[in-house]
């Protein structure tokens, strides 16, 4: 059941990436619309995760997850029939609410329901299904978009969500934390602060860092989040136990994952466009090219979990992130003439690093969380990764766009200088060649910058996280 819940979210995130070119054609979506189709989902998910995690601890993790699955399925059904970009953005925001309710519950249930021995088996199955979603999602998305249109990438969520709800009702025991007072003020402050913060990050590429609107949003976010932190340290029943950050494994693991997610967010944005616009792959072919990264992660996930127990989560996290950085460097060496082998090799190295690092990093983080705060602890992890992904899209997307524009000929039409899709649509062979070269140049700079960022995450993990002390069983889980 946990696998089905995770699967529906994984598939949704993967299938949409290959539908972007079709959405541009069918809905007349411009670049800002495309950004908000993805960002509306991120905005509501990140803004509500902490509150959702607290609700799952208080009112029952199974109950909250079922409500989230039902909402996610309904929103997916509505999204499939959207007649405009605005409608689709609204329904994607509603899907984000459902996702926020589901995500903390799955990881917290895995921690609280299973004992140490069962948890290892459950995590192994859960991680494998997650990778099946990553492998099958892009391929399925390509087939659906090509054969049935973009709406089908949302309709596929509905039967999976229904099956997950049925399985939860039939098979899953309810779990909740001991009763404690609610923290409504903390919930409001966290929702407002996180939503405004992610909104500011999302709008960075459009407004720039020094724009008054950006500065206002950032100021509001900082003030509200400081108020949230102060309140949480003074209230008798805090929604989020901030003392968790005094644990070096929790703080080191979470911040390392944030920096890594910045890189992952940029990878999804850049690489899907590279495959389709530069190499000319169909949506199905672009989806299939994600198979190497998923397979590599599956094969190394169990190894990373096992070695994490033996040599320590700190070392395993640092080694894995270093390998991820090498993968980004290899991606930065790709060109418009790169073949399948070069692309697959770079993605395989990336997947190996992710499979080694993430189980150890998340294990260290979640082992620091008391069982009664499992939902909130999971939500903190999810929130920071969502914020990192949004930051990656904003910053690395801006780096890519700026370098693409600067590399294009000054005599090119203005739309072609800002969008490779517009450049290719003009049908000029010389302009198309220049656009592909410019995009590859921008991608190289972006990937090298990301490699440096992930390497910094490896150093952070090594310096901050605690070394292995006693061979206690680890609560291992992987998110990719």
Describe each region flagged by the PLM.
Residues 7, 39, 43, 70, ...:
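Transmembrane alpha-helical cores of Major Facilitator Superfamily
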Residues 1-6, 249, 363, 422-480:
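Transmembrane-helix exit segments and adjacent C-terminal regions of multi-pass membrane proteins
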Residues 1-45, 149, 186, 198, ...:
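Transmembrane core module of solute transporters
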Residues 119, 159-175, 193-203, 221-234, ...:
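C-terminal membrane-cytosol helix-exit motif in multi-pass small-molecule transporters
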Residues 23-24, 55-56, 140-148, 201, ...:
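Interfacial helix-cap and linker-helix signal at transmembrane-aqueous boundaries
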Residues 49-186, 212:
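Helix-loop-helix hairpins in multi-pass membrane proteins, especially solute transporters
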């Amino acid at each position: 059941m946990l696998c089905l819940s995770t699967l529906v979210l994984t598939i949704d995130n993967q299938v949409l990436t290959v539908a972007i070119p079709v959405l541009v054609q069918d809905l007349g979506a411009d670049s800002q619309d495309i950004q908000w189709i993805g960002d509306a989902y991120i905005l509501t998910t990140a803004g509500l995760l902490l509150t959702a995690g607290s609700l799952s601890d208080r009112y029952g993790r199974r109950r909250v997850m079922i409500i989230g699955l039902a909402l996610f399925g309904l929103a997916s059904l509505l999204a499939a029939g959207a007649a405009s970009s605005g409608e689709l953005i609204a329904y994607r925001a509603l899907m984000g609410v459902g996702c926020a309710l589901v995500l903390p519950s799955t990881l917290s249930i895995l921690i609280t329901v299973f004992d140490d021995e069962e948890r290892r088996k459950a995590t192994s199955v859960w991680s494998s299904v997650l990778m099946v979603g990553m492998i099958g999602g892009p391929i399925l998305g390509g087939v659906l978009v090509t054969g049935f249109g973009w709406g089908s990438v949302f309709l596929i969520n509905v039967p999976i969500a229904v099956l997950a709800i049925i399985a939860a009702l039939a098979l899953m025991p309810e779990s909740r934390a001991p009763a404690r007072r609610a923290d409504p003020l903390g919930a409001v402050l966290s929702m407002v602060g996180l939503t405004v913060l992610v909104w500011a990050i999302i709008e960075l590429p459009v407004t720039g860092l020094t724009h008054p609107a950006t500065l206002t949003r950032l100021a509001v976010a900082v003030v509200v989040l400081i108020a949230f932190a102060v309140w949480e340290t003074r209230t008798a029943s805090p929604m989020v136990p901030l003392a968790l950050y005094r644990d070096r494994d929790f703080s080191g693991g979470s911040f390392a994952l944030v920096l890594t997610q910045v890189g992952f967010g940029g990878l999804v944005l850049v690489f899907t466009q590279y495959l389709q616009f530069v190499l000319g792959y169909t949506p199905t072919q672009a989806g299939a090219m994600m198979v190497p990264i998923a397979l590599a992660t599956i094969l190394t996930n169990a190894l990373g979990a096992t070695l994490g127990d033996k040599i320590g989560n700190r070392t395993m996290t640092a080694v894995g992130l270093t390998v991820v950085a090498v993968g980004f460097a290899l991606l930065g060496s790709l060109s418009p003439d790169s073949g399948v082998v070069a692309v697959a090799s770079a993605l395989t190295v990336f997947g190996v690093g992710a499979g080694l690092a993430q189980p150890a990093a998340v294990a260290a983080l979640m082992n620091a969380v008391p069982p009664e705060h499992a939902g909130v602890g999971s939500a903190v992890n999810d929130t920071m990764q969502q914020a990192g992904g949004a930051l990656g899209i904003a910053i690395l997307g801006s780096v890519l766009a700026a370098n693409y524009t600067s590399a294009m000929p000054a005599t090119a039409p203005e739309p072609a200088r800002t969008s490779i899709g517009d450049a290719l649509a003009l049908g000029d062979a010389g302009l198309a060649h220049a656009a592909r070269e410019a995009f590859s140049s921008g991608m190289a700079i972006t990937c090298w910058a990301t490699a440096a960022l992930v390497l910094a995450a490896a150093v952070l993990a090594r310096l901050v996280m605690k070394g292995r002390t006693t061979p206690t069983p680890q609560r291992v889980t992987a998110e990719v």
